[in-house]
């Protein structure tokens, strides 16, 4: 990528900030939906973003077997090549009969769907849930809570902090 190309975040343009409180509520809503679809043998978090919703969903559903698939693609806000740094453990794979049946994969969001596609190819029969979905990634997930437009950038609470916001009207501050 050259210096002048905009990042995915800049290209998205429309900011969608999510507070801890809102995120917790959305994860609880996701848990309600998933509770009707289970039971699941184990939760698999797609790191790192999937770790937070996975903890909340596992707590709500009483699941104590938690594994990770470690995937890196975005360097801050630019998407590069997908790298699988760690797959599911043999023990979790056995629980899912080798194809992921009865396993619950969780991520914070699906955007282009690249990450979701990669995990689906690893565990085709697993249930894949994300808290937020953009249109391109939506066909990859079985369950999600809120859809946002493709030109939206979601700002998660662990990536942000409180800061001064200028008033909408110029000079009103
Ligand atoms: O649908 P996609 O276009 O593939 O994008 C979605 C993925 O991008 C983000 O992860 P990221 O690679 O930034 O890593 P992180 O979870 O460690 O922040 C997010 O947590 C999803 O896993
Ligand atoms: O914090 C993030 N917000 C997003 O909208 C997004 N899309 C891909 N990766 C992302 N990370
Ligand atoms: Mg991620």
Curated annotation (Swiss-Prot):
Pfam families per the record? Pribosyltran
Which terms are listed as keywords in the entry? Cell inner membrane, Cell membrane, Glycosyltransferase, Magnesium, Membrane, Metal-binding, Purine salvage, Transferase
Q: Where does 5-phospho-alpha-D-ribose 1-diphosphate bind?
A: 48-49, 107-115
User: How does the protein associate with the membrane?
Assistant: Peripheral membrane protein
**Molecular-function annotations in GO:** guanine phosphoribosyltransferase activity; hypoxanthine phosphoribosyltransferase activity; magnesium ion binding; xanthine phosphoribosyltransferase activity
Q: Where does Mg(2+) bind?
A: 108
Q: Which GO terms describe its cellular component?
A: plasma membrane
Where do the annotations place guanine binding? 111, 154
Q: What class of enzyme is it?
A: transferase
State the PROSITE patterns in the record: PUR_PYR_PR_TRANSFER
- Coarsely, its chief localization is membrane
Q: What is its EC number?
A: 2.4.2.-, 2.4.2.22
Q: Which cofactor does it need?
A: Mg(2+)
Residues involved in GMP binding: 111-115, 153-154
Pathway in which the depicted protein is active: Purine metabolism; GMP biosynthesis via salvage pathway; GMP from guanine: step 1/1; Purine metabolism; XMP biosynthesis via salvage pathway; XMP from xanthine: step 1/1
Q: How does it assemble?
A: Homotetramer.
List, alphabetically, the NCBIfam families matched: PRK09177.1
Q: Which PANTHER family match?
A: XANTHINE PHOSPHORIBOSYLTRANSFERASE (PTHR39563), XANTHINE-GUANINE PHOSPHORIBOSYLTRANSFERASE (PTHR39563:SF1)
Instruction: Summarize the protein's role.
Output: Purine salvage pathway enzyme that catalyzes the transfer of the ribosyl-5-phosphate group from 5-phospho-alpha-D-ribose 1-diphosphate (PRPP) to the N9 position of the 6-oxopurines guanine and xanthine to form the corresponding ribonucleotides GMP (guanosine 5'-monophosphate) and XMP (xanthosine 5'-monophosphate), with the release of PPi. To a lesser extent, also acts on hypoxanthine.
Name under which the protein is recorded:
Xanthine-guanine phosphoribosyltransferase
Species assigned in the record: Rhodopseudomonas palustris (strain ATCC BAA-98 / CGA009)
């Amino acid at each position: 990528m050259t210096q002048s190309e905009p990042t995915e975040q800049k290209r998205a343009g429309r900011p969608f900030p999510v507070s801890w409180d809102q995120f917790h509520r959305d994860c609880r809503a996701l848990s309600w939906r998933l509770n009707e679809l289970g039971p699941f043998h184990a939760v698999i978090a797609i790191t790192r973003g999937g770790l937070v919703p996975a903890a909340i969903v596992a707590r709500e559903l009483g699941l104590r077997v938690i594994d990770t698939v470690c995937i890196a693609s975005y360097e801050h806000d630019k998407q590069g090549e997908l790298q699988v740094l760690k797959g599911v453990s043999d023990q979790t794979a056995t629980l899912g009969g080798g194809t992921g049946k009865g396993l619950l994969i969780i991520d914070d969001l699906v955007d282009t769907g690249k990450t979701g596609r990669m995990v689906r190819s690893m565990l085709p029969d697993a249930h894949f849930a994300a808290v937020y979905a953009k249109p391109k990634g939506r066909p990859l997930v079985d369950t999600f809570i809120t859809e946002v437009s493709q030109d939206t950038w979601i700002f998660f609470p662990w990536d942000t902090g409180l800061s001064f916001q200028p008033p909408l009207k110029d000079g009103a501050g």
